[in-house]
Amino acid sequence: MNIFQEPEHVSMLRNTLRQFIDKEMPRDKVNQWDKDDHFPRDVFDKLCKLGVTSLTVPVEYGGSGRDMMATIATIEELCTRSLGIASGYIFCACYAGLNLSEVASEEQKQKFLPEVANGNLLFSYGISEPDVGADVASVKTKAVRDGDEVIINGTKRWCSGPNVTDYIYTIVRSGAKEDRYKNLSIVLIPPSLEGILIEPQQTLGQKGVGGTCDVTFNDVRIPFENVIGGEDGWNDGWSKIVSTGLDVEKIEVSAMALGIARAAVDDAWQYSQERIQFGKPICHNQSVRHMLAEVKTKLEACRLMTYQGAWLADQDVIATVEMSMSKLFVTETALDIVLTCQRILGAYGYVRDFDMERYVRDMLAMPILGGSSAIQKNNIANRLNLPK
């Protein structure tokens, strides 16, 4: 593939999404969603009618076939306007669609994937805990089998969207503590079940994504059929959580950062031509011109790394190093891009009358999501066999 030439169907998808964004996601509405911390499910449902949630679902389950280039392009385009709508898309197409396609049992695929393709099934992630971040294998949330049911007890932290999703895709300890990596399972837990307490956390940015929450499970019962992989998946959750799904999550975050950074550059570029000081637009000043040239260049580098990752994902190859490199470089660079664009706007980049301050708030989380930058550096060094 020529990485410098986007496939025609992806370019057509971009045009469709941009028309949708202009019509259904105008800036004033998006700003209000942000202020109200509101997830507009009606707009999300309209988005799903475009067929974009089918991009991660195999044809035999009602989808259009796995297409990561198109999926990543969808995330990027949506993030140029609304991280909330983009998050809803990720909850459906990626958290549900990609994971179910990769590691679910045949019965689970037949049951759930057609719903994903139609945009009717959203997953939250229940992975992190109050004392568990990067060391996922040390989770303490416990699952005990009781006949045809599983009883769940414990607490998950940084669970995005449980107020709007249908299931929490939850990793639990189902075996003896000593059997690290062989005592974990993944279960699907409906957030509405008795015994579940959802406590929203106040965050700086990422508003309108259904909330970032603590979720506590107190003797919550689910049917055993909700264990991902069925009988074979019990105590085999580690192999599923470290499958290619987590690698792909890295470029999902890269695409989010790329979309936000692109919006920031576009706004700063336009502002520099409209803002008049000393009788001329500020884009005539060399210092501003250099800042804009720099962010444009960095943005292009981010784009290339993001879509290289998407292309590798479409080749169905293990690309852990490349995915970590993309996530590390793109999120850190995109953060620098947005902060530079904020400086171009001066005080206007700090007030809610302009979108720039929202870009800053949303971007600050990107180097943390999907594994922090420090973790990505560890992954890269370890995978490249750098001696410890």
Question: Locations of the language-model features?
Answer:
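Amphipathic, small/basic residue-rich leader segments at the start of a protein or domain
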Residues: M1-I90, Q110-K111, E115-N118, L384-K388
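Glycine-rich beta->alpha junctions and the first turn(s) of the following alpha-helix
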Residues: N2-E8, M12-L13, T80, I198-E300, ...
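Glycine-rich phosphate/cofactor-binding loops in nucleotide/flavin-utilizing enzymes
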Residues: N2-I3, A73-T74, Y95, I241-D247, ...
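C-terminal helix-coil-helix/basic helical segment that borders enzyme active sites and/or dimer interfaces
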Residues: D28-K35, W269, Q273-C283, K296-F329, ...
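N-terminal glycine-rich flavin-associated loop
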Residues: S87-E107, G133-V136
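A short, Trp-centered hydrophobic/proline-enriched beta-strand micro-motif
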Residues: G119-I127
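A structural signal for short hydrophobic beta-strand segments in well-ordered beta-sheet cores
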Residues: T141-V144
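A short core secondary-structure module
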Residues: E149, N153-Q201
